[in-house]
Structures are given as C-alpha cells and as structure tokens.
C-alpha cells in the first residue's frame, strides 16, 4: 500500500463503519418516530444497510485474507462477492415491502403530517457523517480493491444523498405547506434502495462469474511487459479477478535464437515489471514462444480461468 496508515485503515474500516452506522440507525429511527417523518424512518434503512454491510466487511476481509491452501488454490477472495450478494438480496426484499408501504401512505391524504423540525437537524447530522465516511471508505477501497469496501463507500454516498432529500422534504413541508413531500421522499428513498441493491447484486454476480480484469487493466499489463528488453510483444494474455486480486497468465514473444535459460530470465523480468507496475496482482505466470522480428500481431485476450496445475505453478514461479 502507498501509505503506512493504509494498512491500519483497511483493518479498522469495518469496525468504524459498524459503530457509525449503528449510531445513525438508532438516531434516525428514534427521530423518525417522535418527529413523525416517514422519510426519516426510510432513511434509517440506509443506515441499517450500512451496518449490515460493515459486518460483511469485517467477516469478509477476515476470511478473504487467509492464505491459499490445497482445498482453495484460488484463495478465499470470492467470499466477499458472496456476502455482497446476500446483503443485496436482503435489502431488495425489505425495500420492496417499504415501497408498498410508502405508496399507501402517499395515496392516503389523512396520513399526511408535517414532521417536527428535529428531523431536519438529524438529517443534517447524517449528511455530514456520511460524507466523511464516504471519503474514508472510498480511500480504503482504492487501496485494497475490495468489492465489499467499494460497496460500503457506495452505501455511505447513497445514505448522504437520502438524508439530503429528507432535509429538503422537511423544509418543503414546513415552509411551503406541502406535508405530502415527506411520504414522497420516503417513496423515492425506497426506489433508490432497490436500484442500489440491484447494482450491488450485479457487481457480486459478475465477481462470482470470474469476470475479466477489463481491457484497461489488460492494456496496462501488456504495456508493462513490452517495455522489458528482449520481449517481442505479448502473444496472449488471460486475466481475471478473484475477489480483490488479479490472477493472470501470459505468453510473450522472444528471439528464436534465445536459449531456454535466456527466455526464462526474460519471463522473470516481465513478472517483476508487471507486478511492480500494477497493484493487486496475486498471481502472474509468464511463458515464452519464439517470435520473428516484424511480427506485429496484436495480443489475444481471454478470461478463461486457470487450471489447478497452472495456479500452483504460477504461485511457485512468483
């Protein structure tokens, strides 16, 4: 990691998020009940979601950081995607229920009430805290490339946005004499929660399906490899995410006149260059094939998973 404090933050982010989200959830639920705000009660669901996600971060990062073993040659990184999917499914179900409830209140004018101004102050506190937590968790997510911590950052961003909507709704209800705004904001929040749950679910689904590391990452790998002296281009590259880490293998072109030992030295130099250039590469296996000067064939990309033998070989090579 780039800074010495990053390791400390990555270990504490889950506990900090859990404590903050628990306090916010209790505050929002209490204020929503005594202040008569449906929007604030729905906003409490954002903090409950954040709280559960923080628990998933604590559990997931603990398990995913375990070393490789014979039964798990790819490591334990996918547990983060599994837990992200569980959280998303739970909230899609819960917010579906809240959506129906919000529609019922919005359509029944007898249930429209102007919330107490204490709700406005609670919303402002929530905005400030969640903006701070968003930047904190986003920084950790960038350093660790953890899907769970990325999800945490998204959740805090959504929570801050929702609290902002609650604040605007309270202002509208009080100063524009529009008490229906509060249940309308509650309806918007539930729809937003559903959409957020869908995004998290699809991200977790792609992770479980061994999605490719992406063209941008693959191009950076190729660029780093082709800068190594003796490399005559990258012939084939296969890279994918396993949890927060990248597993890849590549075939490079070398001079047909090179000895086996010389080709092996070039492969080792490529490994060092690529791993030094691109963070989060857990495994990189490099092999060489003869390639004549002037062959400008572009590298082929593949997202097919490595075999068990290839995985164990690449770990030995690294």
From Swiss-Prot:
Effect of residue 159 to A: About 55% magnetic response, fewer cells have iron crystals which have altered morphology
Protein name: Magnetosome protein MamM
Variant or mutagenesis effect after changing residue 260 to P: CTD dimerizes, binds fewer cations. Loss of magnetic response, still stabilizes MamB
Region listing for Transmembrane domain (TMD), in residue ranges: 1-210
Organism: Magnetospirillum gryphiswaldense (strain DSM 6361 / JCM 21280 / NBRC 15271 / MSR-1)
Binding site for Fe cation 1: 249, 285
Membrane protein topology class: Multi-pass membrane protein
Keywords, in A-Z order: Biomineralization, Cell inner membrane, Cell membrane, Ion transport, Iron, Iron transport, Magnetosome, Membrane, Metal-binding, Transmembrane, Transmembrane helix, Transport
Chain spans, region C-terminal domain (CTD): 211-318
């Amino acid at each position: 990691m780039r800074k010495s404090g990053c390791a400390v933050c990555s270990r504490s982010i889950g506990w900090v998020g859990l404590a903050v989200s628990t306090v916010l959830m209790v505050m929002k639920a209490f204020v929503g009940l005594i202040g008569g705000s449906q929007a604030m009660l729905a906003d409490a669901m954002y903090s409950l979601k954040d709280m559960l996600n923080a628990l998933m971060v604590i559990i997931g990062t603990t398990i995913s950081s375990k070393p490789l073993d014979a039964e798990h040659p790819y490591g334990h990184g996918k547990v983060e995607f599994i837990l992200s999917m569980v959280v998303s499914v739970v909230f899609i179900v819960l917010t579906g229920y809240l959506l129906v409830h919000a529609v019922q209140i919005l359509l029944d004018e007898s249930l429209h009430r102007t919330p107490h101004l204490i709700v406005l102050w609670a919303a402002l506190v929530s905005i400030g805290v969640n903006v701070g937590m968003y930047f904190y968790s986003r920084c950790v997510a960038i350093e660790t490339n953890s899907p769970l911590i990325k999800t945490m950052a998204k959740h805090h961003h959504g929570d801050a946005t929702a609290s902002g909507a609650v604040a605007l709704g309270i202002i509208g209800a009080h100063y524009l004499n529009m008490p229906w705004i509060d249940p309308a904001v509650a309806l918007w929040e539930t729809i937003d929660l559903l959409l957020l749950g869908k995004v998290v679910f699809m991200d977790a689904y792609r992770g479980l399906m061994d999605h490719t590391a992406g063209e941008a990452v693959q191009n950076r790998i190729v660029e780093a490899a082709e800068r190594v002296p003796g490399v005559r281009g990258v012939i084939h590259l296969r890279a994918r995410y396993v949890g927060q880490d990248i597993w890849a293998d590549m075939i490079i072109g070398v001079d047909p006149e090179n000895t086996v030992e010389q080709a092996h030295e070039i492969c080792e130099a490529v490994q060092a260059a690529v791993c030094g250039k691109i963070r989060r590469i857990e495994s990189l296996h490099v092999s060489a094939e003869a390639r004549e000067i002037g062959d400008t064939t572009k590298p082929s990309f593949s997202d097919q998973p490595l075999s068990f033998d290839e995985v164990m070989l690449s770990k030995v090579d690294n």
